[in-house]
Amino acid sequence: MFIINLLLYIVPILLAVAFLTLVERKVLGYMQFRKGPNIVGPYGLLQPIADAVKLFTKEPLRPLTSSISMFIIAPILALTIALTIWTPLPMPHTLIDLNLGLLFILALSGLSVYSILWSGWASNSKYALIGALRAVAQTISYEVTLAIILLSIMLINGSFTLKNLIITQENMELIVTTWPLAMMWYVSTLAETNRAPFDLTEGESELVSGFNVEYAAGPFAMFFLAEYANIMVMNAMTTILFLGSSLNHNFTHLNTLSFMTKTLALTLLFLWIRASYPRFRYDQLMHLLWKSFLPITLALCLWFISIPVALSCIPPQL
């Protein structure tokens, strides 16, 4: 039974990721006055299936000088972590209900750095290694602000369980009271998932393709799936943390529909940002975090600690 639950969890995520690639190409196409994919199937709807067949039937190439085991393990690890992060998310019910769900998600998003680092090092290519080092520095840096923002939210929420967050936001979404945190969280998720305008790991002009330059066929598709699964999970997290994923506790179908709609809207905003903004310079990226976001998040964290203490109020307890 657990295997069936697991499959019912994983297959829709992979399908959503596949069609997210189509949505991205269509959105970018229309924003650049092009059509996007429109040959395979009606309106290009079967393009992700054609891409999957092409990628998984090609011969997986491996550089002669690469470290074989690590080269193969890295993409598998990336996809495994990207899919595992979904398990504690209430949509509105979780696959595994964890007491420390938020810490679990934060820890796994930190682990995803290893797959990028291993792939860059095992490829034995200077471009891949530079891309991997950039990715590691960027991801670890932005995790600092993500952790502090989560701590601030937890001080309002009263526990680390994600289900408690839904109860906290029954009357009012947290984005109303914590909008500066929400803005910084959203920008940090862009950097955490290596998306434009923070896609310095795959700067085509200087790094050819970044950490995955030596990958082709199936392993490349795994990295691709992991990246888009991470984008969706980060937007799902944003919905749960700030937008209140539930509408009515008597109709759980409505809750799921509300959650999906908000997550989709945030994902489309990711694509809109990619079409609108040029890439940051690396020093600007680091200055934004260490000189802007970190001081503000620390100050806001102190503010959210002082409010319950000053007003002698406690967060909602289950």
Swiss-Prot record:
It is a multi-pass membrane protein. Keywords: Electron transport, Membrane, Mitochondrion, Mitochondrion inner membrane, NAD, Respiratory chain, Translocase, Transmembrane, Transmembrane helix, Transport, Ubiquinone. It is found in: Mitochondrion inner membrane. Its EC number is 7.1.1.2. It catalyses: a ubiquinone + NADH + 5 H(+)(in) = a ubiquinol + NAD(+) + 4 H(+)(out). One of its GO terms (molecular function) is NADH dehydrogenase (ubiquinone) activity. Pfam families: NADHdh. It comes from the Eukaryota. InterPro entries: NADH_UbQ_OxRdtase_su1/FPO, NADH_UbQ_OxRdtase_su1_CS. Signal peptide: none annotated. Coiled coil: none annotated. GO terms for cellular component: mitochondrial inner membrane. The keyword Translocase applies. The keyword Transport applies. Its main location: mitochondrion. GO terms for biological process: aerobic respiration. PROSITE patterns: COMPLEX1_ND1_1 (PS00667), COMPLEX1_ND1_2 (PS00668). The chain crosses the membrane at residues 2-22, 68-88, 100-120, 136-156, 172-192, 223-243, 253-273, 294-314. Core subunit of the mitochondrial membrane respiratory chain NADH dehydrogenase (Complex I) that is believed to belong to the minimal assembly required for catalysis. Complex I functions in the transfer of electrons from NADH to the respiratory chain. The immediate electron acceptor for the enzyme is believed to be ubiquinone. Belongs to the complex I subunit 1 family. This is NADH-ubiquinone oxidoreductase chain 1.
